[in-house]
From Swiss-Prot:
GO terms for biological process: microtubule-dependent intracellular transport of viral material towards nucleus; symbiont entry into host cell; viral penetration into host nucleus. It comes from Human papillomavirus type 55. This is Minor capsid protein L2. Interacts with major capsid protein L1. Interacts with E2; this interaction inhibits E2 transcriptional activity but not the DNA replication function E2. Interacts with host GADD45GIP1. Interacts with host HSPA8; this interaction is required for L2 nuclear translocation. Interacts with host importins KPNB2 and KPNB3. Forms a complex with importin alpha2-beta1 heterodimers via interaction with the importin alpha2 adapter. Interacts with host DYNLT1; this interaction is essential for virus intracellular transport during entry. A motif (Nuclear localization signal) lies at residues 1-12, 443-451.
Length: 460
């Protein structure tokens, strides 16, 4: 048999228990302090309020009456009442015109004119004299004679005094009357030259270039090409100076100029002509500077090694440079001799002129010794005049026509003596018409000549 649980009854509230158990003295220990507001919290508020003032907030366990001053009701502005019925316009009074009234309304004229500021004439009440006022409309004409003053000014020039100014200023005169000025504006005496002073305080040159002050020149901004953020790469290809785009791509071989920034777009993986320019997407403008006694040509390149989804590229910056030439000191000046003839030389050397039949030639014998076969030529020399050199050539020789050349000749008063060359000291070996070679070089071993890709003035 299942037992049913007893129903739990609700306990009476503290106020109900206090009303029944107060007189009998059987109230629990927590009922009386709670109803009489004498709990620990009430005691803290009671003794703490002596040192802390909360104003009229009414903080406590009492009823919500707003403290001692109570709550201040908020004043509200009364809303004006709007009538719901139809509104009527107030009538306007209109002056009516009778049928017999004239259509033109005459203006009302004032009977008396009052002049402000004028004294009022009051007629006397008792007998007296009369005041007669007369007014004339004709204006008064005054006979005033105008007196004219004539002022004359004369200027006398002192020839012993030199006026430094060119234009002479006019003297100060009165504004009224007639003014007579007899002076010239431009003087006829010579002008005095005043030297200008220079403002240069200090200068490195011996002679100043101008008379303006030397401006304070600040330090020129240096290009940060050798910082740790840039990778230094030396380029040896000469195309880097004129057309650097040929080292990066094959698509656009057109030359765009050396003073512009070059941009490249690589949609696919490609191999550049130079491996040093791998993944280069931009080359900045060139810069020429001096570096350790050399002229250096530089460009800054931007790599595009990685791209994000937003389109931003990630890559390092590279400093490409190439040394053009060393900066050497000033070369020694060498005096050049004139290559033209003097004024007294009138002889001409004509290679196309025919030999003179009346002129007798004296052949000069020459001895030749060589190990290679050749055709002997007859050479004739004369001390002055035209010189004829007949040559026997193995084939036809093309002669380019040119101008006549004037060479200095020996004087007729001095006997002719041929000049012996200092070098070579040994015998002369001739092979052909215009070529000679030393015999020791005939059997010399020929070496293959290797041409370096560097510039001629750049050290390896």
């Amino acid at each position: 048999m299942a037992h049913s649980r007893a129903r739990r009854r609700k306990r009476a509230s503290a106020t109900q228990l206090y009303q029944t158990c107060k007189a009998a003295g059987t109230c629990p220990s927590d009922i009386i302090p709670k109803v009489e507001h004498n709990t620990i919290a009430d005691q803290i508020l009671k003794w703490g309020s002596l040192g802390v003032f909360f104003g009229g907030l009414g903080i406590g366990t009492g009823s919500g009456t707003g403290g001692r001053t109570g709550y201040i009701p908020l004043q509200s502005t009364p809303r004006p009442e709007i009538p719901s019925g139809p509104t009527t316009r107030p009538p306007i009074l209109v002056d009516t015109v009778a049928p017999g009234d004239p259509s033109i309304v005459s203006l009302v004229e004032e009977s008396a004119i009052i002049n402000s500021g004028a004294p009022e004439l009051v007629p006397p009440s008792h007998g007296g004299f009369e005041i007669t006022t007369s007014e004339s409309t004709t204006p008064a004409i005054l006979d005033v004679s105008v007196t004219t003053h004539t002022t004359s000014t004369s200027v006398f020039r002192n020839p012993s005094f030199a006026d430094p100014s060119v234009v002479q200023s006019q003297p100060a005169v009165e504004a009224g009357g007639h003014i007579l000025i007899s002076t010239s504006t431009i003087s006829s005496h010579p002008v005095e030259e005043i030297p200008l002073d220079t403002f240069i305080v200090s200068s490195s040159d011996s002679n100043p270039a101008s008379s303006t002050p030397i401006p304070a020149s600040g330090a020129r901004p240096r290009i940060g090409l050798y910082s740790k953020a840039l990778h230094q790469v030396q380029v040896t290809d000469p195309a880097f100076l004129s057309s650097p785009q040929r080292l990066i791509t094959f698509d656009n071989p057109a030359y765009e100029g050396e003073d512009v920034s070059l941009e490249f777009a690589h949609n696919t993986i490609h191999q550049p002509p130079d491996d040093a320019f791998m993944d280069i997407i931009r080359l900045h403008r060139p810069a020429i500077q001096s570096r350790r006694g050399r002229v250096r040509f530089s460009r800054i390149g931007q790599r595009g090694s990685m791209y994000t989804r937003s389109g931003k590229h990630i890559g390092g910056r590279i400093h490409f440079y190439q040394d053009i030439s060393p900066i050497s000191a000033a070369a020694e000046e060498i005096e050049l001799h004139p290559l033209v003839a003097t004024a007294h030389d009138t002889s001409l050397f004509d290679i196309y002129a025919e030999p003179d039949p009346d002129f007798t030639e004296e052949p000069v014998p020459l001895s030749f010794s060589t190990s290679t076969p050749f055709q002997r030529s007859s050479v004739s020399a004369t001390p002055w005049g035209n010189t004829t050199v007949p040559l026997s050539l193995p084939g036809d020789m093309f002669v380019q026509p040119g101008p006549d050349i004037i060479f200095p000749t020996a004087s007729t008063t001095t006997p002719y003596s041929p000049v012996t060359p200092a070098l070579p000291t040994g015998p002369v070996f001739i092979s052909g018409a215009t070529f000679y070679l030393y015999p020791a070089w005939y059997f010399a071993r020929k070496r293959r000549k290797r041409v370096s890709l560097f510039f001629a003035d750049v050290a390896a």
